[in-house]
Amino acid sequence: MKETGIHKFVGDQLSRWPLACNNFRALKDVRVRELKVGGLNVKLQFNPARMISSAAKLTKEEIAKRRCFLCRENRPPEQIMLKFEGRKGKKYDILVNPYPIFPDHLVIAKSKHTDQSIWHRYIDMLDLAKEYSDCAFFYNGPKSGASAPDHHHFQGVPKGMMPLENDINHYLELLLQNESQDNPLSYLVSNQDAHLYHYQKFTTGVFVLRSETSKSAAKLFYRLLDCADIPEGEPEPLINLYSWWTNGEFRTVVVFRRSHRSHHYWSEGPDHLTMSPGCADMAGVFIVPVEKEYEALTSEWLSDMVQEVSVPQEEQERIIDRLTRDQQLLNVGVMSADELVFEILADGAGPRKAKVREGKIEYDGALYDELYFEAPNPSTMFAEPSFVLHGVTIGVGFHWERKENQKFAGALKVVVEKNRLVAINVIGIEIGRAHV
C-alpha cells in the first residue's frame, strides 16, 4: 500500500540522515498545550528547531543570496526521494522534511526550480491526496508561510493531525447525515459534483470544498480563487490550502490571508511573537520556537494574531458575494461566415463544422436556432482557452491581413444573422474590481 510505503520511506531516510533523525526524535518530546481560538480547540507546539523557518528572511534580495535548499543539486547527500508524476508531465520529488512539525512530515518539491504557485498544480495536489490517502497535503502561498517561495512545493502529513481538518471533517459528516443544526458550514455554490461551503468558525476567510472528482473540484476551486482580491504585484491571492481524500471524495480547505506576519513579529515590545503563521498554524497547530512566548501565550493574544493575518470581514463578504451572484456577461462577436470550423478543447473531439441551412444552423445532422458551448471554467483570472475558431481574420485593412486559427477563453455562442453564421465569445466581467 502507498501509505505503508511512505512510512517505510521515512524510516529509510531517518536511518541514513542524522540531522533529520535527531529532529524527528526530538518531535516526540516537544511540549504541547491547548487553547481556544474562534471556537476551535487549537494546539501550541514549543518547537525550537522550527526557528529556521519562523525567522526566515523572505525578501527577494535575501532569497536571491541563498542556495535553494529544494533544488536537487543543493540537497544534502543523505537526502533520498520518491518520484511522483503530476498531470501534463509535471514531475515532483517526495522528500522527508528534516525540520518536522508532524510525524512522517513530507515535502513534495517540483523537480525543477520554479516559483511557488497553485495555478495548474491544484489537480496534482488532489492526485497526491488520492494516491497517498492516509495523508493530508497542504500548500503555503508564496506570501502565506512558504519558507521557499521561489521553489514550488507541497507538504504532506498524516491525516487527523490538524484541528481544523478534524473539525471540518466532523461537520461535513453531520451535513451528509442531514444534521445541519448549529453547523458552522453554510452552503454557497456547486459545480456538478463539487460543493462549496463557508466555515464560520476559527477565523474569517475559511472555505470548504468537497467533490467526488478532481475535475469538478478544480473548476470550483479556481472559481473561488478568482473571487478574491490579488495584492499588488502578486500572482495569486494569499492562501493556505489543504486537501485530503476520505469517504470517496476530495476535501479541500482554503484559508484566505491578508498578510504573512502580524505586527507581533516586528514588535520590540512585550507583545512580540516569533511566529510566522503558515499552513500548520492556520490549521490549529501553532508553532512557537521561543519558550517564554510559548508559556505566555493566551487565547486572546493568539486570536489577535490570527485575525490580523486573515482577510478582513469585508473582503470575506466580497468573496461570498462574487461567488453567489450572477456574473455579468459580455458578448463579443469574433467572426461571421457561411461555414464555421471550431474545436471545443475540453472534449478533445477535434474540428467540427456548422453551416447555414434554411435560415438555421446545421450542426451534427440537426438544425438549431443557436449553439452554445459552456466554458469549463467561468473565472477570469484563471481562465484557460476553451475553444478554437478556424480561419479568424486578423489585421483587417493592413498589409499583413491574414487568416489564422485562434484560441479563446469563455463560452462559444453561434447564431444566424443575415443568413451567415456569427461566432460570439461570451466572457464574464467584473465591474469595479482592481488589485489592492
Predicted regions and their residues:
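Conserved, single-site charged/polar hotspot
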Residues: E317, D321-H435
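Histidine-centered nuclease catalytic patch
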Residues: D150
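Short, glycine/charge-rich beta-strand/loop segments that flank catalytic centers
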Residues: Q79-M81, N140-S144, H390-H399
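Active-site microenvironments that recognize anionic phosphate/pyrophosphate groups
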Residues: M1-M125, C135, P142, S147, ...
